[in-house]
Design a protein with these regions (language model features):
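Hydrophobic h-region of N-terminal signal peptides that target proteins for export
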Residues: 22-27
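Periplasmic-binding protein-like
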Residues: 91-96
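Internal alpha-helical transmembrane segments of multi-pass membrane proteins, especially GPCRs
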Residues: 15-18
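A short, gly/pro- and small-residue-rich
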Residues: 108-113
Length: 288
């Protein structure tokens, strides 16, 4: 498996991320490998791991434009959120996944305010050329279709896939066709592009990954089948912020110039028609 041998795990390329199991107990310093000492013009930013590829690019652009230093960590959302909610970790800005987490941080006074950041989406993905002729979600239930799913992966990814199958009424037939149940979506994608399966369900952001984008095709899933809870990302200003003016400047950049970068990485901009619709539909507003 040459493709798999050449791959890197989704965590290896995240700036400042290490084993997430230690996060909740140990706080931010253990997840900040390569952490640079705080500077007066620095801003410490955490995001969930799914945003990391985009935020590395956003931070580079912001630093080049302003000269400010962004101390960035991207890691497992659940561990970071738990660390913050239990007061075992501190950061100045937090890109959180799920509106409920942002609301809980706000209610507890751990964050000062939040704004919509972006939205994710889920798609049906097939190897380039679509050898099995997959057309839609229903085709995953057809006899003989080899379905690869990341149900062993950490939530919200695995839970979202299960939710899509449940809402579409396809859980039983698709599970019967599942030939691979992976714990790592990157490893699963490596197998898919090598022809070890016919189709899978993934987050759209993964279709932009350099290792896959030229080796796959994808198609939309009807939004009515996609659970709403994991789609929302928010940008939170935390109570630990040292320079609120810098935090607001960074937030404004992420929500303006940064939106194009997020879209290139497979996310939905908060300024797009779909983004504006989801903000209203989900009530992504900081209301106290």
């Amino acid at each position: 498996m040459e493709f798999l041998k050449d791959k890197i795990s989704r965590r290896q390329f995240l700036k400042g991320a290490v084993a997430t199991a230690a996060v909740a107990a140990a706080g931010p310093k253990l997840i900040s490998a390569g952490y640079t000492p705080f500077k007066s013009d620095s801003l410490e930013v955490w995001t969930c791991g799914g945003l990391s590829e985009a935020f590395l690019q956003i931070n580079d652009a912001y630093e080049a434009k302003t000269g400010h230093n962004i101390q960035y960590t991207g890691a497992f959302a659940g561990a970071l959120g738990k660390s913050l909610l239990t007061l075992k970790g501190q950061t100045e800005m937090f890109g959180a996944r799920g509106l409920e987490l942002a609301q809980n941080l706000r209610k507890k006074g751990i964050s000062l305010r939040f704004k919509p950041l972006c939205f994710t989406d889920y798609v049906l993905v097939v190897p380039k050329g679509n050898p099995a002729g997959i057309r839609d979600l229903q085709d995953l239930a057809e006899p003989g279709v080899r379905v690869m799913l990341p149900l062993g992966a950490s939530p919200p990814g695995s839970a979202s896939v299960q939710g899509i199958l449940k809402k579409s009424g396809l859980t039983d037939p698709v599970m019967q066709n599942m030939t691979v149940n992976e714990t790592c979506v990157i490893k699963m994608m490596c197998g898919l592009v090598e022809g070890n399966g016919d189709a899978s369900i993934i987050e759209k952001r993964l279709t932009t990954h350099d290792r896959f984008k030229d080796k796959i095709e994808y198609m939309p899933i009807d939004p009515k089948f996609i659970p709403p809870a994991p789609l929302t990302f928010t940008l939170n200003v935390m109570k630990y912020v040292k320079d609120e003016k810098l935090a607001e400047d960074y937030s404004d950049f992420v929500r303006s110039d940064g939106q194009e970068i997020l879209e290139r990485n497979g996310f939905t901009s908060v300024h797009s028609a779909r983004g504006l619709d989801l903000i209203e539909r989900f009530g992504v507003k900081d209301v106290q």
